[in-house]
Amino acid sequence: PDLLKPIEPWDTQSIIFTSGTTGPSKGVLSSYLHIFTNAGPETWHFVTGEDRFLINMPIFHIGGMGVIFVMLCRGGSIAVMDGFDTEKFWPFVRESRTSAFFLLGVMTTFLLKQEPSQHDKDHSVRLAFMVPLTETCTEFYERFGIDVYTIFNMTEISSPIVSEPNPTKRGTCGKKRDGVDVRLVDENDCEVALGEIGEMIVRTDRPWGMNSG
């Protein structure tokens, strides 16, 4: 049936709640174009429609819901796990034929603490996101044969910083992707010198490419 009202790119697609890092969790209004900018091919170009992405984080948060949007944009598939469980993780990954997943840094530590096995590379996974990137990146890549990426993102923005595979610089978030401007500024919005601490400000070259409020 016809829609009662046409859907426009700037219409609100979802309200996703933040982690509450700096205070109470806040609902973020995301337009259709914000979601596409965050999840579309220009951000994570190495994820394709042939992938099956594991969801092992809450879907009320961008860490879980964002993966759904990423695969919707590509026509790919997802595998849904009840929650992260160190003992059940690899059996589920193998059974579901997962090819990509997202790990918080501490999850990586838990997986590496498991006893090494001859089956460590017996899976179909080709890439993983590690956020934040920890010093275990190289160990994880070598042990499990999985390319590791990292990003800097927030519910309100659209993945402005993305790494190359298997970064070696400890603490890196990656580099500015195409389609965004990123600056580090002081309290007067003046750009700080190289090596100095500043506030990161971001804008996209696409209208409605970030949150609506």
Say what each PLM segment does.
Residues 2-17, 24, 46-52:
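Conserved pre-ATP/AMP-binding loop-to-beta segment of ANL
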Residues 73, 90, 95-103, 112-170, ...:
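Gly/Ser/Thr-rich phosphate-binding loop
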Residues 5-7, 171-176, 191:
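Short Gly/Pro-enriched turn/cap motifs at secondary-structure boundaries
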Residues 190-213:
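Conserved ATP/PPi-binding loop(s) of AMP-dependent carboxylate-activating enzymes
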Residues 31-32:
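Short coil-to-helix segment of the ABC ATPase nucleotide-binding domain corresponding to the Q-loop/switch region
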